[in-house]
Amino acid sequence: LSDNPYQQLIVWNPEEEEIVGGYRFIDGATVAGGKGNPQDDLSMGHYFQFSKQFLEDYLPYSIELGRSWVQPKYQPAVDPRKGMFALDNIWDGLGAIVLKYENMRHFYGKVTMYPSYDRNARNWVLNFLGHYFPDAEGLMHPIVQAELPKLPELEQHFPIDQTDFSTSFKKGLRNLGKLTSEFGES
């Protein structure tokens, strides 16, 4: 076990007296200031090589978000109302973490895209993220580089207006929703 174990955000339904779901997280400051090696101790370290700049300038002010989960009764496919309740309360819990760790400026973590997710839709999502949120500082590098085709019509669907990033991002996000729905994904 690590000297700095992950913590769990637990979402509780007081009316049903049961756990709804949770989120695993770790305070980067405890890892950065600890005896261990962040590259070995953090889940993201198994997938990404951290830069010196990340370890020194970002990790002490970051929360790594790990695996989130929702128990079966609260899955949207089982009960849409309970599914919305679960998601809303997990987001409220993340808000509580923001308030509790007020010196944290960055939240990061990995996202799992299952093989069953349409490959074309996945390529659009990944190109969208890389287009609007590039790692310009080279803070992390994948240990295993994934093949990602660059889509020729990227600029057409995902405009970037440096004078009004918010508006161009919203337009790109709407376009992403349309593109992924064409492949049966949301």
Description of each model-found segment:
Residues Q8-V11, Y108-K110:
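Extended hydrophobic secondary-structure segments that form protein cores and membrane-embedded regions
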Residues L1, E15, I26, G66-W69:
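Anionic group-transfer/hydrolysis microenvironments
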Residues T30-S186:
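Acyl-donor binding region in acyl/amide transferases
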Residues I10, E17-I26:
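Conserved beta-strand in the GNAT
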Residues S2-L9, G33-G34:
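A short helix-loop-beta-strand connector motif used in the catalytic cores of GNAT acetyltransferases and
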Residues P5-Q7, G21, Y61:
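Residues that flank catalytic or metal-binding motifs in active/ligand-binding sites
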Residues E15-E18, A77:
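Short, solvent-exposed loop/turn segments that connect beta-strands within catalytic domains
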